[in-house]
Amino acid sequence: MTPTAASELLLSIESTCDETAAAVIRRDGTVLGQCIATQETLHEQFGGVVPEIAARAHLERILPVIDTALTQAKVRGEDLTAIAVADRPGLAGSLLVGVVAAKTLALAWNKPLISLNHLHAHLYACQLIEGAPANIYPAIGLIVSGGHTSLYVCRTAIDLEYLGGTIDDAAGEAFDKVAAMLSLPFPGGIEVAKLASQGNDKAYSFPRSMIHDPGDDFSFSGLKTAVRYAIVGPGRQDFASLDISDQVKRDVCASFEAAVVDVLVSKCRRAIKRHRNRNNDPQNSINRLIVGGGVAANQRLRRDLQAAADKDGFELWIAPPHLCTDNAVMGAIAWKKFEAEQFASLDLDITPGLQRGF
């Protein structure tokens, strides 16, 4: 009997940072079961993700999370067609837990193993939007998250060309650091956005680093330093003892968020314009932008990107907010590698880190 899209099932596993996630996805894209275990309360007291704590939490949760996804889907391991796991990039200990689990299950159930690039999967989440075209590629892709801020030419879901990225801090990292300066709860990016919506985004004139640079690289460390000096002045280390008014916090957040979004939107517009009529070849023209990653849930970024798309006449698809943060559903990209017969061996190793070029 020939398998059909309704009978072929994928188990997707995600453990790149501090979310342990699994999903069972049919080949037609239907999600039959999914589970995410977050670690926010474990890392809250530290103001950021502690790699060793994250890895230990993954160890405790990986099997229950997988079991929950399978139970929701009402399938057994033997019913699966393939197993996919994100093996790059991310925290070494976190990645290792997911990859070892996937390899073990692939061996035990005699299923093909598929390795995933976590960042490429974030972009593929745009393909999962209701109403998206059957093939959302080619496109310019923007990943904006706590660990990465990068631009790509996405020829297909699994054929991406890295254009450029941050040379220092990622946008999401800058959000979290500013939140820490203002003693806001973890995770800080959400809290900064909340206060920003109530503040004056012109109260502080923060730098838009590299906004006029013709390339595709980003820089946010200078912005982070400018915010620090606006709050405490040069040289001071102690933020906890500061008495910062609520209005100042709102205005700092609004001005900071505006600076980040201005840079992201400007770089995307420039990349689209450059590739729209590349070499005057309509066959290679790209007039679509896809956006993924945790910061892609930011409402100001979504609004300003849509305004740019309307003004410049390009097509915009941003991952739905629930698929912007780390999840296993975006692992549906594995079906593209399955179709291309791009399988991993049981010797699969992790590729951790936040290096440029992923």
UniProtKB/Swiss-Prot annotation:
Entry EC number(s): 2.3.1.234
GO terms of molecular function: iron ion binding; N(6)-L-threonylcarbamoyladenine synthase activity
Cofactor descriptive note: Binds 1 Fe(2+) ion per subunit.
Signal peptide interval: none
Binding-site list for Fe cation: H118, H122, D326
Binding site for substrate: I143, V144, S145, G146, G147, D176, G189, N298
Key words of the record: Acyltransferase, Cytoplasm, Iron, Metal-binding, Transferase, tRNA processing
EC class name: transferase
Subcellular localization: Cytoplasm
Record's GO cellular component terms: cytoplasm
GO biological process, one term: tRNA threonylcarbamoyladenosine modification
Any Pfam family hit: TsaD
Catalytic activity annotation: L-threonylcarbamoyladenylate + adenosine(37) in tRNA = N(6)-L-threonylcarbamoyladenosine(37) in tRNA + AMP + H(+)
Source taxon at top rank: Bacteria
Entries under InterPro entries matching the protein: ATPase_NBD, Gcp-like_dom, KAE1/TsaD, Peptidase_M22_CS, TsaD
Needed cofactors: Fe(2+)
Function: Required for the formation of a threonylcarbamoyl group on adenosine at position 37 (t(6)A37) in tRNAs that read codons beginning with adenine. Is involved in the transfer of the threonylcarbamoyl moiety of threonylcarbamoyl-AMP (TC-AMP) to the N6 group of A37, together with TsaE and TsaB. TsaD likely plays a direct catalytic role in this reaction.
Record-stated family: Belongs to the KAE1 / TsaD family.
Protein name: tRNA N6-adenosine threonylcarbamoyltransferase
Organism, as annotated: Rhodopirellula baltica (strain DSM 10527 / NCIMB 13988 / SH1)
